[in-house]
Amino acid sequence: MLADQSSQGPVVNLAVLALLQCGRVIEAQEAADAIVCDARGRGAQLAYAEASLIRALIFYTRGRVNEAAADAQAALDGLGQSDNPHAQTALATRVNCMIERGELTEAESLLNDAQSPLAPTPAIDAYVLLTRGRLHLHRKDIDAALEDVGAVENIVRDFGEVNPTMLPWRSLAGVIAHLAGDPVRSRSLIGEEIRLAQLFEVPIAFGVALRRRALTETGQHALGTLREAITVLASTEASLELARAHASLGRGLRRAGQRVEARAQLGIGLDLAHRCGATGVEADIREELAAAGGRPRRSALTGVESLTPTELRVAQLAAQGISNSGIAEQTFVSRNTVAWHMRNIYRKLAIESREQLLTLIND
């Protein structure tokens, strides 16, 4: 892709988004890594910020929450300075990551403090509003969530049949409608998103819609839908969505009195959520697992075991004496992202130098 155009070309990021929309997530990741590296090498700040945003969306789709948050922040830092409308997309992506980590109060403050008018692009408006609707749902403010998804529906009314990968608003609106006591509308919205996901052959969106449909069902119908969602999502790169599906199935099995299988499903979801860095999701699953009679091992808050897979990889490279710049080149992230990971590593390991890091990692 970069053979014909540099990272500053007008279509490179659009091409990566197209790969993501089609479910070709790994190809999108590889292309985004190359674009980020090219932009960094050229010192092209705007191109770097835009490419970081695209990669944040890919990381988020894959469930790699910490990496998505770091790239979204890098994009927000760069795009916010240029009044680029995509700064709102970066902001919403950052908020989505905070939701996954259970940082709901901080996420709400970030949205409120931004004080930015909605962007002139309807699709960006819809993405921001959908994110705010998710936040309101997690905070159990159903009326506010209804208002946000209603605004999204008004924006996209004339879009026609659109691939739901990037904006799965119907299934979220369906869950909210169900909680608001409107089962007919709930079934209609989620059913339409399932149809569109099958039409465009996008398994991640299909799996998400199935899981959300199960939230509106009961008994064996819900359990069957969740098993189907797991089968669909297991064939994709969407690890966090798969974690949610396993957790939902475990919750349903517990309520059906099938506690042994419930614990097994919840254990799978817990492991996946931990690997994704989705600490808020992990905490919810841990609570459900305890209710099912399980004794989940407490998450390590300090020490090597507390490091996420990405943090461990960065720590191992740093312990080899590789500089932050060198780590950035090897892991295809920015130096700021490496510095952010290093701060987390030092905090979790209670150290202040790389010499101490070498001892801990080797032990």
Q: Where do the PLM segments sit?
A:
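Helix-coil-helix junctions within alpha-helical repeat/solenoid scaffolds
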Residues: M1, A15-V304, H341, D363
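Flexible inter-repeat linkers and adjacent short helices
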Residues: M1-Q8
